[in-house]
């Protein structure tokens, strides 16, 4: 076990686990295959977090880290983490995790002029570049993080989707950005905790069949924040602490909302705004 004033790190189930107390209620869990990397997060606010007092002990079977509010118990043989209240009562179990190496690629024309094919679909006109070629950027991983939820536990969150699902238990949900889909890599539980994944790629939530897990399409490592807020307000408070306060949108983002595929010129957009303001539509 490696212990500093900021984190503890150990090897479990052939991978590296680092547990980092952010507050007494929030613990960051990073799982790497060969190393734990620093990352420039696009989700977590960049600021200095004060040091948190914690205790950590390791024996042949497990590592335990404890703050004033949360106890994390990591089983070394399996990588299973029990997330508990400080008094030992359990919130949930992160059952296991796996990382599979992949090539991270981008698509480029290689300097050629793009060959664009315009196709009319039920969602409007789509532009497809025909001469894109894959180019490897770096090595990465596909990941799965398994959870063992209680039978009556409800799972909410994951952003905005079209299906109208309130409780995701027993469901499969794809988290990707689209016209009417606004995914968020966060779920909250009726048991009084939340889990925020620091992941900007495609994700899948799966609670069908015999296994429950979240799939992460492209990551350097598994990186999530366990938030033991006890109440929904407490979880949202922890989420805001990590990601920053909710921002007020500019004036043009409020009022009448149009369902429109796209505007082709800035002049067209400005004319639409001028017309709506002229006729008194806010």
Give the label of every model feature segment.
Residues 278-282:
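Short, intrinsically disordered, charge-balanced linker/junction segments flanking boundaries
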């Amino acid at each position: 076990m490696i212990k500093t004033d900021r984190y503890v790190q150990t090897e479990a189930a052939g991978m590296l686990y680092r547990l980092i107390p952010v507050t007494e209620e929030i613990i960051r869990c990073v799982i790497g295959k060969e190393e734990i990397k620093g990352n420039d997060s696009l989700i977590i606010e960049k600021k200095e977090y004060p040091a948190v007092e914690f205790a950590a002990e390791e024996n042949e079977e497990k590592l335990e880290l404890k703050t004033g509010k949360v106890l994390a118990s990591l089983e070394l043989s399996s990588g299973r983490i029990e997330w508990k209240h400080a008094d030992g009562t359990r919130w949930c179990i992160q059952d296991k995790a796996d990382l599979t190496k992949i090539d991270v690629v981008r698509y480029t024309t290689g300097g050629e002029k793009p060959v664009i094919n315009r196709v009319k679909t039920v969602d409007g006109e789509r532009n497809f570049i025909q001469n894109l070629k894959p180019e490897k950027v770096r090595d990465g991983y596909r990941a799965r993080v398994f959870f063992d939820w209680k039978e009556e536990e409800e799972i909410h969150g994951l952003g905005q989707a079209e299906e109208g699902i309130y409780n995701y238990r027993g469901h499969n949900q794809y988290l990707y950005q689209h016209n009417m889909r606004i995914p968020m890599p966060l779920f909250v539980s009726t048991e009084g905790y939340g889990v925020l994944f620091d992941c900007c790629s495609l994700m899948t939530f799966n609670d069908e069949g015999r296994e429950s897990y979240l799939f992460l399409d492209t990551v350097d490592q598994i990186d999530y924040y366990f938030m033991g807020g006890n109440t929904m307000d407490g979880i949202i408070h922890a989420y805001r602490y990590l990601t920053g306060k909710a921002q007020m949108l500019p004036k043009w983002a409020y009022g009448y909302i149009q369902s429109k595929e796209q505007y082709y010129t800035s002049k067209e957009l400005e004319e639409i705004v001028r017309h709506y303001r002229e006729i008194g539509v806010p």
